[in-house]
């Protein structure tokens, strides 16, 4: 099914934020912070995997992902979609179906030997591959999968995250020659939280303190205070 409608970016971002709140995918715990893939400590966590259990919401989010890519990257820019083990795999399958493309997945660790040891599925040499993750903060885990695809002979110029923390900008992606596409960010989540009063004042203050100075907050709460980008 090829996407043919292209909603406004702001509308998509707000709706995804509302849907994540609706399915209770937003978690807060400043006393026992969450540890992100980057090694950072965070008082908030978005469980995008919950989207899979809500078919209407899941379908809408994947429609938005397809619209975002077709509009911003183009209709004939990819030869296959790659999902990273584990969270990216189902979203890769859903997106590949919408775009009418083959799908592969990338293991966290090689299985066996050879340049394709981390790749499951058919990826011919020189394939233009889009890597998808459910969410990304600094790109740490996404680039592990991107590097594996490149090492196996694939070309990766684009990545997409359904949710992007957007607290460090995109320098890591610029340096890695990858254009990052995304649908919603933490600023969208906060806008909905404020409008619907989903956080009390103390919680809101803690979340904003983290978003304004994430590494400082992380360092004070058991996480890394600097990133190797």
From Swiss-Prot:
- Write down the chemical reaction(s) this protein catalyses: orotidine 5'-phosphate + diphosphate = orotate + 5-phospho-alpha-D-ribose 1-diphosphate
Indicate the family of this protein: Belongs to the purine/pyrimidine phosphoribosyltransferase family. PyrE subfamily.
Source organism: Rhizobium leguminosarum bv. trifolii (strain WSM2304)
Give the quaternary structure.
Answer: Homodimer.
Which gene specifies this protein's sequence? pyrE
Write the record's keywords in alphabetical order, separated by commas.
Glycosyltransferase, Magnesium, Pyrimidine biosynthesis, Transferase
Q: Which GO terms describe its biological process?
A: 'de novo' UMP biosynthetic process; pyrimidine nucleobase biosynthetic process
UniProt binding sites for orotate = 137
Q: Which GO terms describe its molecular function?
A: magnesium ion binding; orotate phosphoribosyltransferase activity
* Annotated metabolic or biological route of this protein: Pyrimidine metabolism; UMP biosynthesis via de novo pathway; UMP from orotate: step 1/2
Q: Which domain of life is it from?
A: Bacteria
Explain the purpose of this protein. Catalyzes the transfer of a ribosyl phosphate group from 5-phosphoribose 1-diphosphate to orotate, leading to the formation of orotidine monophosphate (OMP).
The name on file for this protein is Orotate phosphoribosyltransferase
EC numbers, comma separated: 2.4.2.10
This protein's cofactor list reads:
Mg(2+)
Q: Where does 5-phospho-alpha-D-ribose 1-diphosphate bind?
A: 107-108, 111, 113, 133-141
